[in-house]
């Protein structure tokens, strides 16, 4: 694991927006400072949780640039650069490299349902076009296409394809990769509820929704798992369990943006087709936050 450069709790950071849906860059900068202070080990910007499908190309560039500048080398910045167009994924990855991002996160192409060979050729083309460490991102619940472990292992032979975010929640699948992939190929959980199990099997970190709300506790859980301190890791995860589950009570990032807004860190702005968290879930999420020891800045 020492050969993996980026490890630990990597927040899949939300994108703050004003009520009219415009980007709130001031809050975005403050949010990055908050994560640095709270011990987050890396910032993943403009991913699923960052509402990448509804930001335009210029905004996508601006968010990457702002994240890199605000982080200022204090923590690694991983730029979401995935697209279902290989050309677009290449363009975004080139921008991320030139902006100074430490790595890119490239989602499995969605909607057009490529074959396994198509997935291999897509990611290889991106890797050959731009020399930035590339992390694959498999989330078949959203993309429909599902990259098989054998395809991942083929891609792991390409020097600048350095890891995968596996959001399937399938621990057996993750362990299979840990057993067969090169030692310097990072396996990140993309499923908060099962992340601890993968970490204890040798996983390298978690790209986390929960870390938006409980960054310090997520960091502590990872550190304990890496140290083999099962009791401490389980104790941290026990406090986080309801958050892991209830942050998906409606489609991500609806609940997490509401929760971060209750902490006073951002406003509640979303872009259609996402809509605000249903009122009936507010108390459920407040209770989950309370179990994790999170203070609410906004009173009921």
Swiss-Prot record:
Report the locations given in the UniProt record.
Cytoplasm
Q: Which gene encodes it?
A: dapA
Q: Which UniProt keywords apply?
A: Amino-acid biosynthesis, Cytoplasm, Diaminopimelate biosynthesis, Lyase, Lysine biosynthesis, Schiff base
Per its UniProt entry, which superkingdom is the organism in? Bacteria
Q: Name one Pfam family in it.
A: DHDPS
Q: According to the UniProt entry, what is the EC number of this protein?
A: 4.3.3.7
Protein name in UniProt: 4-hydroxy-tetrahydrodipicolinate synthase
Q: How does it assemble?
A: Homotetramer; dimer of dimers.
Q: Which InterPro entries match?
A: Aldolase_TIM, DapA, DapA-like, Schiff_base-form_aldolases_AS, Schiff_base-form_aldolases_CS
Please give the Gene Ontology molecular function terms for this protein: 4-hydroxy-tetrahydrodipicolinate synthase activity
Cysteines paired by S-S bonds: none
Gene3D superfamilies for the chain:
Aldolase class I
């Amino acid at each position: 694991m020492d050969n993996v450069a980026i490890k630990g709790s990597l927040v899949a950071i939300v994108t703050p927006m004003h009520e009219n849906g415009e980007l709130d860059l001031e809050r975005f900068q403050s949010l990055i400072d908050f994560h640095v202070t709270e011990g987050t080990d890396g910032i993943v910007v403009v991913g699923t949780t960052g509402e990448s499908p509804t930001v335009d190309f210029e905004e996508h560039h601006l968010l990457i640039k702002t994240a890199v500048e605000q982080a200022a080398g204090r923590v690694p910045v991983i730029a979401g650069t995935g697209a279902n167009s290989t050309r677009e994924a290449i363009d975004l990855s080139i921008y991320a490299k030139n902006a100074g991002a430490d790595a890119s996160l490239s989602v499995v192409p969605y909607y057009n349902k490529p074959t396994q060979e198509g997935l291999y050729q897509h990611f290889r083309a991106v890797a050959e076009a731009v020399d930035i460490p590339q992390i694959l991102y498999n989330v078949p619940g959203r993309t429909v296409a599902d990259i098989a472990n054998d395809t991942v292992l083929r891609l792991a032979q390409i020097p600048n394809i350095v890891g995968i975010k596996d959001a399937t929640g399938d621990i057996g699948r993750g362990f299979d990769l840990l057993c067969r992939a090169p030692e310097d190929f990072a396996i990140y959980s993309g499923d908060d509820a099962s992340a601890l199990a993968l970490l204890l099997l040798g996983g390298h970190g978690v790209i986390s929704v929960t870390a938006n709300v409980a960054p310090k506790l997520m960091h502590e859980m990872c550190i304990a798992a890496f140290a083999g301190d099962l009791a401490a890791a389980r104790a941290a995860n026990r406090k986080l369990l309801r958050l892991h589950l209830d942050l998906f009570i409606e489609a991500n990032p609806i609940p997490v943006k509401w929760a971060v807004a209750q902490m006073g860190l951002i406003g509640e702005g979303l872009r259609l087709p996402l809509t605000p968290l249903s009122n009936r879930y507010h108390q459920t999420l407040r209770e989950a936050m309370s179990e994790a020891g999170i203070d609410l800045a906004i009173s009921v």
